[in-house]
């Protein structure tokens, strides 16, 4: 039988079969690939991380085979979840399987399974419904403010949602602001492969440039994208390398690029420490403000009589925004008293200005014992995350063009000291 040399290597996989085999080419020693993978998962768990595997099952794959494969990786390797690809997968059977009941399942559509299986919250919707509204707002392509709001506050009572602006099926986050068009010529398909609808913007020059004002704007938009993802409800997801601005030179379908195009350039990480530090600080802010990851959907009212609605929206006037998605700016106020963690109950106000001009938004008060502190400012090129937050006066907040600012409502130091003295005195 003749053998045929393939012109290129699809190193992503996505082929039928081999559902019980470790990919030996990822191992240091191919003969010990299974042992190495188990050691990797143990090490991840020791550091508080999880391992989620991605599987592609073509339509028509035997249901029993799918369930057996998933159980195998959970029982033999202790993986923590699966991102499943393929049409008409048996999601009800997967959701009801007791051996997978503590395993995170990511899929595009759970159908009836998402409503029926309320006994455990391990089902997550993973699709691009967040990606496109976010890109449209950032780069001004048929944007819709109402659609953006829906995505930022989206949270299910049963299903979880994964939010991303970039993933492996498209531009990296940095390339989203460097290229108007895909550049997949190296894939050998006449640049016809990959997503043609990217809603990207190069801001004046296609690809890298030495023009400082363009590079500053691109970095600001990168910071805005990070903030949008991290300030949204649901599960934030970043494509590996996006945390420090990794580029694939405009290739948005690097399935066959087992080379510097498809690799992450870790050397460039050292020259982009400011971006990585910004992401780390924003991630920490999200962890310290659990109201940004509320386990239940918001009601948009003060149903517990805590002093303010759980989530409210603000435009030029407090408690009001422009109707019908006609604007490019709004403020979202999260009431910290509705946080599930009593130790972290600061209010959070996220002010968005996606327009190319300065905008003023209303800034509601936070009571007599609290003040607003500016914590994050995407327009600040040097210190976008403030180590020493600035006090902001109530009434309104001015936003430069293409800017997101995040404020925290905290107790004023004098009141905090009085409370601590009262506790010590038993008052």
For each predicted feature, which ranges?
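Aromatic- and acidic-residue-enriched carbohydrate-binding clefts of CAZyme catalytic domains
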Residues: 2-46, 59-76, 186-207, 258-263
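Short, solvent-exposed loop/turn and secondary-structure capping segments
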Residues: 2-5, 175-178, 249-251, 361
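Short loop/turn motifs at secondary-structure junctions
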Residues: 15, 77-78, 234, 398
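Active-site neighborhood of glycoside hydrolase catalytic domains
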Residues: 36, 43-49, 56-114
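Active-site cores of enzymes that catalyze phosphoryl transfer or operate on phosphate-rich substrates
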Residues: 40, 52, 167
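A generic secondary-structure signal for well-formed alpha-helical elements
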Residues: 44, 48, 74-77, 81, ...
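Conserved alpha/beta catalytic core and glycan-binding cleft of carbohydrate-active enzymes
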Residues: 91-245, 253-257, 290-297, 303-310, ...
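Carbohydrate-interacting/catalytic domains
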Residues: 215-219, 223, 228-238, 242-427
């Amino acid at each position: 039988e003749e053998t045929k040399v393939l012109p290129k290597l699809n190193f992503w996989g996505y082929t039928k079969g081999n559902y019980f085999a470790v990919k030996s080419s990822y191992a240091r020693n191919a003969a010990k690939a299974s042992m190495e993978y188990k050691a990797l998962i143990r090490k991840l768990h020791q550091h508080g991380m999880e391992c989620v595997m991605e599987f592609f099952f073509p339509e028509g794959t035997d249901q029993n085979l799918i369930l057996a494969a998933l159980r195998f990786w959970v029982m033999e390797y202790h993986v923590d979840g699966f991102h499943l690809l393929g049409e008409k997968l048996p999601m009800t059977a997967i959701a009801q399987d007791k051996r997978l009941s503590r395993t995170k399942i990511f899929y595009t559509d759970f159908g009836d399974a998402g409503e029926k299986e309320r006994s455990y919250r391990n089902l997550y919707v993973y699709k691009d419904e967040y990606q496109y509204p976010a890109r449209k707002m950032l780069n001004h392509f048929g944007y819709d403010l109402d659609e953006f709001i829906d995505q930022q506050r989206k949270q299910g009572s049963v299903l979880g949602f994964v939010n991303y602006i970039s993933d492996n099926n498209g531009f990296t986050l940095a390339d989203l602001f460097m290229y108007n068009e895909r550049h997949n010529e190296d894939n050998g398909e006449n640049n016809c492969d990959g997503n043609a609808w990217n809603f990207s913007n190069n801001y004046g020059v296609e690809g890298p440039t030495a023009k400082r004002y363009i590079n500053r704007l691109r970095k600001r938009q990168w910071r805005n994208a990070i903030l949008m993802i991290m300030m949204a409800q649901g599960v934030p997801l970043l494509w590996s390398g996006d945390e420090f601005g990794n580029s694939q030179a405009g290739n948005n379908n690097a399935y066959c690029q087992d080379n510097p195009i498809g690799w992450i350039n870790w050397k460039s990480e050292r020259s982009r420490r400011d971006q990585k530090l910004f992401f780390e600080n924003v991630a920490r802010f999200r962890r310290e403000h659990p109201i940004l990851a509320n386990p239940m959907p918001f009601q948009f009212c003060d149903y517990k009589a805590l002093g303010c609605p759980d989530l409210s929206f603000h435009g030029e006037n407090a408690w009001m925004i422009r109707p019908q998605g006609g604007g490019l700016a709004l403020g979202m106020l999260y009431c910290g008293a509705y946080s599930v963690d009593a130790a972290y109950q600061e209010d959070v106000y996220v002010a968005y200005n996606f327009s190319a001009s300065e905008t003023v938004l209303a800034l509601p008060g936070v009571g007599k014992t609290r003040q607003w502190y500016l914590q994050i400012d995407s327009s600040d090129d040097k210190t976008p995350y403030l180590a020493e937050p600035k006090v902001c006066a109530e009434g309104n907040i001015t936003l430069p063009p293409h800017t997101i600012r995040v404020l925290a409502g905290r107790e004023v130091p004098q009141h905090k000291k009085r409370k601590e003295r009262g506790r010590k005195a038993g008052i």
